[in-house]
């Protein structure tokens, strides 16, 4: 499972790096707790700060799991016994934190946020949902003509 896992992490890193570089909008998003603090959702582009955090957890955490896993798979090729012990601790701790983050991500993406599961299911989101949760992205797509003025039931292509 190590090689497919590593390939998956690399593919994810390459596919979505452009949209997941942190910016100033993300700082405001975090200050407002992603909309938990206050009455409205903070502005966000295609990926909000929470989604970017998950991306970096996958890329950096997955990279740490892969690197430490390879050290454990091929003992003593690169390191001594002390390095192997460190790799064991890093591998275990990062894997547990990774799984915890993914469980939180799965919850938010399914039952924790209305409309999120539908976006994953068919690749589109309701325009009104997009304007509420990713207002800067929705405005940009509407301005580009990707979506006409939003009817109440209108849908737009979700983040890929």
Locations of the language-model features?
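Membrane-embedded alpha-helical bundles that constitute the cytochrome b-like, heme-associated redox core
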Residues: 1-160
């Amino acid at each position: 499972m190590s090689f497919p896992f590593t390939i998956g992490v690399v593919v994810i890193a390459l596919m979505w790096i452009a949209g997941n570089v942190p910016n100033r909008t993300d700082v405001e998003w975090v200050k407002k707790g992603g909309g938990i603090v206050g009455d409205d959702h903070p502005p966000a582009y295609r990926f909000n700060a929470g989604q970017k955090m998950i991306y970096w957890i996958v890329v950096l955490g997955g990279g740490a799991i892969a690197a430490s896993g390879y050290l454990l798979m091929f003992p003593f090729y690169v390191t001594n016994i002390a390095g192997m012990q460190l790799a064991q601790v890093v591998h275990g701790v990062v894997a547990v934190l990774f799984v915890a983050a993914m469980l939180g991500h799965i919850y938010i993406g399914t039952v924790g946020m209305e409309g999120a599961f539908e976006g994953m299911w068919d690749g589109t989101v309701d325009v009104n949902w997009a304007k509420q949760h990713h207002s800067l992205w929705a405005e940009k797509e509407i301005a580009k003509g990707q979506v006409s003025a939003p009817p109440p039931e209108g849908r737009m292509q979700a983040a890929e």
